[in-house]
């Protein structure tokens, strides 16, 4: 059987060790004679799963004690509404950094609840897109918070700086880059991330929120999106996505076994450098993102002759290189190389790219 590497942007590849363990435990979890999917979320057995998952995530990210960790539904799109309704209070304005597709999507949702101060930080130079340094961002004085997306999956744009905005409340959508390298959680008021890219399967959303920001929700906020309600109920205000929570917990343990986020950062940088190097080495392929803002997680690329795209994708698929088609709004190709993608998968892709160019260049 051909070795398969899944380059999907999400739902994304999971560590094979995690899948094997889940397979082994699927029908008889911990000797109970049933699946973890079938037990009560309030049972002592599942409570242990939940507690261990939170502890391991706190250890991995070094989350300070004055932050709550919530395991929620709804993905990042639910958080696009939850953030303003939890944090605006009496304010009518928040700063929204617009650096790509998902940042702009957050703006559109926030417009239902406030008047966002939209700050376009993209730069354009001879067809190459980048992001202006944070020191050039024109933040307002009276914003309730500053929202940005550190990694844009579609555009392949990354903001690699961490925020240093004094006392401003910083909110970050880390859906596609959480756990890919160490970050300083204390620089943020809220971090949120859909699980389906770098945490676990779709259906779970992780929210990390500083305790002093709880209890400011607007009255019209649905209880299921209220950070204070979720925190007071240990993320079990309603039945949570238990299987996704369990699998994410296995991923956290796998990350610790691999050496933690420092080690993952080294691996992810090496994978990205290998793939960008293959693209930059030739005129046959191109990436139109400024070097300083190239994503380690999502690498879009185009061929000089777009008529070859379909052939490239079909031949790649035949060799076990799956899900390389670019997003519908961007076209071309995109390789998502999250934590679970081994460097062998990236080497297989770059070898295929070189061979394809040899035959069609």
UniProtKB/Swiss-Prot annotation:
Pathway: Amino-acid biosynthesis; L-serine biosynthesis; L-serine from 3-phospho-D-glycerate: step 2/3; Cofactor biosynthesis; pyridoxine 5'-phosphate biosynthesis; pyridoxine 5'-phosphate from D-erythrose 4-phosphate: step 3/5. It comes from the Bacteria. PROSITE patterns: AA_TRANSFER_CLASS_5. CDD domains: PSAT_like. Its EC number is 2.6.1.52. GO terms for molecular function: O-phospho-L-serine:2-oxoglutarate aminotransferase activity; pyridoxal phosphate binding. Its main location: cytoplasm. InterPro entries: Aminotrans_V_dom (IPR000192), Aminotrans_V_PyrdxlP_BS (IPR020578), Pser_aminoTfrase (IPR022278), PyrdxlP-dep_Trfase (IPR015424), PyrdxlP-dep_Trfase_major (IPR015421), PyrdxlP-dep_Trfase_small (IPR015422). Pfam families: Aminotran_5. Pyridoxal 5'-phosphate binds at residues 76-77, 102, 153, 173, 196, 238-239. The keyword Amino-acid biosynthesis applies. Keywords: Amino-acid biosynthesis, Aminotransferase, Cytoplasm, Pyridoxal phosphate, Pyridoxine biosynthesis, Serine biosynthesis, Transferase. L-glutamate binds at residue 42. The keyword Disulfide bond does not apply. Binds 1 pyridoxal phosphate per subunit. The modification N6-(pyridoxal phosphate)lysine is found at residue 197. HAMAP family: SerC_aminotrans_5. Catalyzes the reversible conversion of 3-phosphohydroxypyruvate to phosphoserine and of 3-hydroxy-2-oxo-4-phosphonooxybutanoate to phosphohydroxythreonine. This is Phosphoserine aminotransferase. It comes from Yersinia enterocolitica serotype O:8 / biotype 1B (strain NCTC 13174 / 8081).
């Amino acid at each position: 059987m051909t070795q398969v590497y899944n380059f999907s942007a999400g739902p994304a590849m999971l560590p094979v060790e995690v899948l094997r363990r889940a397979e082994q435990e699927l029908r008889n979890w911990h000797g109970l004679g049933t699946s973890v999917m079938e037990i009560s979320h309030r049972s002592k057995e599942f409570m242990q799963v939940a507690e261990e998952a939170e502890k391991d995530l706190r250890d991995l990210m070094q989350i300070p004690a004055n932050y709550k960790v919530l395991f929620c539904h709804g993905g990042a799109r639910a958080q696009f509404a939850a953030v303003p309704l939890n944090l605006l209070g009496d304010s009518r304005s928040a700063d929204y950094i617009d650096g790509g597709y998902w940042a702009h999507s957050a703006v559109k949702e926030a417009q239902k609840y406030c008047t966002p101060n939209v700050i376009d930080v993209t730069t354009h130079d001879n067809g190459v897109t980048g992001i202006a340094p944070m020191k050039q961002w024109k933040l307002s004085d009276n914003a309730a918070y500053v929202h940005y997306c550190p990694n844009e999956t579609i555009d392949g744009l990354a903001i690699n700086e961490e925020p240093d905005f004094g006392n401003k409340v910083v909110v970050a959508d880390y859906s596609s880059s959480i756990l890919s390298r160490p970050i300083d959680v204390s620089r943020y008021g809220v971090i949120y991330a859909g699980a389906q890219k770098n945490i676990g399967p779709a259906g779970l959303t992780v929210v990390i929120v500083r305790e002093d920001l709880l209890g400011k929700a607007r009255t019209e906020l649905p209880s299921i999106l209220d950070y204070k309600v979720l925190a007071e109920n240990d993320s079990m205000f309603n039945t949570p996505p238990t299987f996704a929570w369990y699998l994410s917990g296995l991923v956290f343990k796998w990350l610790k076994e691999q050496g933690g986020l420092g080690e993952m950062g080294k691996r992810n940088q090496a994978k990205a450098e290998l793939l960008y190097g293959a693209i930059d080495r030739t005129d046959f392929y191109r990436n139109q993102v400024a070097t300083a803002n190239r994503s380690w997680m999502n690498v879009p690329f185009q061929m000089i002759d777009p008529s070859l795209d379909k052939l490239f994708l079909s031949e790649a698929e035949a060799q076990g290189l799956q899900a390389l088609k670019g997003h519908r709004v961007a076209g071309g190709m995109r390789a998502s190389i999250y934590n679970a993608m081994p460097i062998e998968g990236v080497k297989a892709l770059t070898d295929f790219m070189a061979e394809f160019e040899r035959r069609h260049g």
